[in-house]
């Protein structure tokens, strides 16, 4: 049965969470895929020049989209501005709404009777996620002119560092099961926490950037040309773009463990799995290089032939041990900031609901 939720409205997220907890016995996986670009326009001279002179790079990592700083959501509660802090619109739609939803349905994800082992939290990121756009002191991206890229870089960091010892206190808090109303079954031991994965759909032809019909089909033509020129990321169709997320959601845990094994054997960790396709459109999930994390967190050059042969972002360099330590420390700070923000907003929502109840 389909459900509707506004991820920019935390009360809507809370309401959906309650419905799911009351009507479903468990969740094997939750795919966190919704996006708000926040763009207000295109720098057309820059776009035309970039596509004409540097097609593959510009339609993979575009530099011509325009976004304002300081976009915020509508008020979440009736508590007033003196009690309710600002909440970044792109941050809430792309990260925080998902984050709150996943925490709220943790009883379903931690159900002991799971088909493929522990439940799965699958973050859908973007090829455009770049750590340089993320400022941990501006975790909501209110001051940046690249709020979309900032929010997706935050998704990357949360997923890739979730199993590190340095983030464990805050990740454990996120995975905790809040007290549920009604009788609770007693269990001999705490159920296992979910596994967290990261993916992206490649470059698809969607309406996330509103364009007129002639421009939309011109965009698709540019995507096709980029694929023919060797881009591994132009899946174009949303069906092909779903390849990696669906693989993560439906594969047996042993299959996913085997896929990550070469990276872990070489000192790495979690992998960003992207939907990729060849010139003929045959899709497959592959490892994606991440700024500050490299290929699966492995220091040095890529360890798999497929990764070494795949086209890289211009300017990409092999991961160093120092960069990896910085990324892990950034993960610790981001997890701490997100958990503090979640707890703050849960308290505000509790207060708002109590206020409404007292007036009823």
Protein language model features and the residues they cover:
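NAD(P)H-dependent oxidoreductase Rossmann-fold/reductase module
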Residues: 1-4, 15, 19, 23-28, ...
């Amino acid at each position: 049965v389909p459900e509707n939720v506004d991820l920019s409205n935390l009360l809507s997220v809370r309401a959906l969470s309650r419905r799911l907890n009351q009507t479903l016995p468990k969740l094997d996986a939750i795919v966190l895929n919704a996006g708000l670009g926040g763009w207000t326009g295109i720098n057309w001279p820059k776009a035309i020049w970039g596509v004409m002179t540097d097609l593959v790079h510009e339609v993979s990592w575009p530099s011509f989209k325009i976004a304002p700083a300081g976009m915020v959501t509508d008020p979440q509660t009736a508590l007033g501005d003196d009690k309710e802090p600002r909440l970044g619109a792109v941050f809430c739609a792309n990260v925080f709404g998902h984050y709150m939803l996943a925490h709220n349905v943790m009883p379903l994800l931690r159900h002991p009777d799971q088909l493929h082992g522990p439940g799965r939290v699958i973050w859908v990121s973007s090829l455009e996620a770049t750590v340089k756009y993320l400022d941990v002191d501006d975790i909501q991206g209110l001051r940046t002119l690249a709020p979309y890229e900032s929010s997706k870089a935050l998704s990357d960091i949360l997923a890739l560092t979730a199993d590190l010892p340095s983030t464990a206190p805050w990740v454990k808090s996120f995975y905790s099961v809040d007290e549920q109303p009604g009788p609770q079954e007693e269990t001999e031991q705490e159920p296992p926490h979910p596994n967290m994965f990261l993916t992206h759909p490649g470059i698809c032809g969607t309406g996330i950037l509103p364009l007129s019909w002639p421009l939309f089909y011109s965009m698709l033509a540019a995507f096709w040309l980029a694929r023919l020129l060797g881009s591994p990321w132009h899946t174009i169709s949303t069906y092909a773009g779903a390849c990696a997320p669906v693989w993560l959601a439906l594969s047996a845990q042993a299959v996913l463990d085997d896929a990550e094994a070469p990276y872990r054997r070489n000192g790495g960790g979690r992998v960003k799995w992207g939907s990729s396709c060849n010139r003929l459109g045959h899709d497959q999930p592959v490892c994606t290089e991440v700024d500050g994390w490299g290929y699966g967190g492995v220091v040095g050059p890529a360890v798999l032939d497929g990764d070494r042969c795949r086209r890289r972002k211009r300017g990409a360099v092999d991961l160093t041990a120092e960069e990896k330590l910085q990324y892990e420390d950034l993960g610790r700070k981001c997890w701490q900031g997100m958990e503090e923000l979640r707890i703050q907003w849960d308290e505000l929502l509790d207060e708002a609901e109590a206020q409404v109840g007292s007036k009823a």
